[in-house]
């Protein structure tokens, strides 16, 4: 089961030299993670553009879908998996 978060909260992400997430900090918790999958989404360039790098990550406590908003330069949490 997964939980899609209504608001996509901003999170802190530490990355390796290639830009892969290695640690996620959310709600004061620091979680080392490994990348399972990643993909890029670019849509609606003619109105409110979306340019995101999505990354599915797994940690010791959870599996999550996070993304880097390439327009704003901020990381967000979109979904948590049980």
What spans do the regions from the language model cover?
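Non-catalytic peripheral regions of nucleotide-handling enzymes
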Residues: 1-82
């Amino acid at each position: 089961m997964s939980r899609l978060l209504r608001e996509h909260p901003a999170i802190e992400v530490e990355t390796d030299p290639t830009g892969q997430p290695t640690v996620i900090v959310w709600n004061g918790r620091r979680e080392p993670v490994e990348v399972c999958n990643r993909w890029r989404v670019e849509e609606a360039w003619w109105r409110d553009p979306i340019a995101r790098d999505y990354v599915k990550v797994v940690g010791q406590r959870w599996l999550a879908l996070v993304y880097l908003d390439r327009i704003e330069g901020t990381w967000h949490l979109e979904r948590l998996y049980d």
